[in-house]
């Protein structure tokens, strides 16, 4: 048992007097019950204003059997108010106010319903924040990603049908390059649509180690290059991913494999001459 806790459940056999809210207590609920053998007892739940030891609690509730609360606040309160063994009561004192449990699952569920940032739990759930702040940030990122993806809308363009027709047939060498020089053709919107509907991996380019580390074996890989990236396109990692074998040297060296990867590039420019063999590239004009 923890040496000092806030919330206690108690049983007091053969009580002689009613209980009242001590100044050190924040909330108290109890009722008179009859046990299986007919023993009359108080079954109760108490929340203290500060952490309290078992010795201190025994002074407040002489003769009571005390245990720290193991379930939720609501479960402990309900157990002290159950009807099946009730003789009299229940009696409540103080204000019952459910607070968030300092546990990772509870905090994650609260984040999902409230939209709070991890740092907002630093005071009320300090242990969880201290141990799992990175997990909470990652979880919030996934929530934000899901919310954003749900809002993405697509305005269909004819060239998109051509891309989907190409994807119907697997080709272990083909890289689909969607070329739209003017901008505004819907390239990025279509890339978002594929992320939303096909669990695609999306990248705007970068170093091989970073891209290989981020890629999680998705079978559809999308490169959506800004116009300013033309001189910095990493053609090597595009080809590695298409081959289904890519090496990541970020944090630790690892080789990732995938049986088949479809690669689609969206750009305002065509690939630089000589970077791919001619049979590699299928250009779709947006």
Curated annotation (Swiss-Prot):
Reactions the enzyme catalyzes: ATP + H2O = ADP + phosphate + H(+)
Span of domain CRESS-DNA virus Rep endonuclease: 2-96
Residues that coordinate or bind a divalent metal cation: 33, 41, 84
Short motif RCR-2, span: 41-43
The enzyme's E.C. designation: 2.7.7.-, 3.1.21.-, 3.6.1.-
Gene Ontology biological-process entries: DNA replication
PROSITE patterns recorded: CRESS_DNA_REP
Listed GO CC annotations: host cell nucleus
Active site, per annotation: 79 (for dna cleavage activity)
The family this protein is said to belong to: Belongs to the nanoviridea/circoviridae replication-associated protein family.
Note: The genome of nanoviruses is composed of six to eight segments. In addition, some isolates contain subviral DNAs.
Protein name per the record: Master replication protein
Naturally occurring in which organism (per UniProt): Subterranean clover stunt virus (strain F) (SCSV)
Gene it is expressed from: DNA-R
């Amino acid at each position: 048992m923890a040496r000092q806790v806030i919330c206690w459940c108690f049983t007091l056999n053969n009580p002689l007097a009613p209980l009242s809210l001590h100044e050190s207590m924040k909330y108290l609920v109890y009722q008179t019950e009859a046990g299986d053998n007919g023993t009359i007892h108080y079954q109760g739940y108490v929340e203290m204003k500060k952490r309290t030891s078992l010795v201190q609690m025994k002074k407040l509730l002489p003769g009571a059997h005390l245990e720290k609360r193991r379930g939720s606040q609501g479960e402990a309160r309900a157990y002290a108010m159950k009807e099946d063994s009730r003789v009299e009561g229940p009696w409540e004192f103080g204000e019952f106010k459910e607070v968030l449990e300092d546990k990772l699952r509870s905090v994650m569920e609260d984040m999902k319903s409230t939209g709070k940032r991890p740092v907002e739990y630093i005071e009320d759930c300090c242990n969880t924040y201290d141990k799992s702040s990175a997990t909470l940030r990652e979880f919030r990122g996934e929530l934000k990603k899901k919310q954003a993806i749900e809002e993405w809308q697509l305005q269909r363009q004819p060239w998109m049908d051509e891309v989907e027709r190409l994807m119907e047939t697997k080709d272990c060498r083909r890289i689909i390059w969607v070329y739209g020089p003017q901008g505004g053709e819907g390239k990025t919107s279509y890339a978002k649509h594929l992320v939303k509907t096909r669990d695609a991996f999306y990248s705007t380019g970068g170093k091989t180690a970073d891209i290989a580390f981020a890629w999680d074996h998705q079978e559809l890989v999308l490169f959506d290059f800004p116009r300013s990236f033309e001189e910095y396109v990493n053609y090597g990692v595009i080809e590695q991913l298409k081959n289904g074998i890519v090496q990541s040297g970020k944090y630790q060296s690892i080789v990732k494999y995938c049986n088949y990867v479809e690669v689609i590039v969206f750009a305002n420019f065509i690939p630089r001459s000589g970077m791919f063999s001619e049979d590699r590239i299928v250009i779709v004009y947006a």
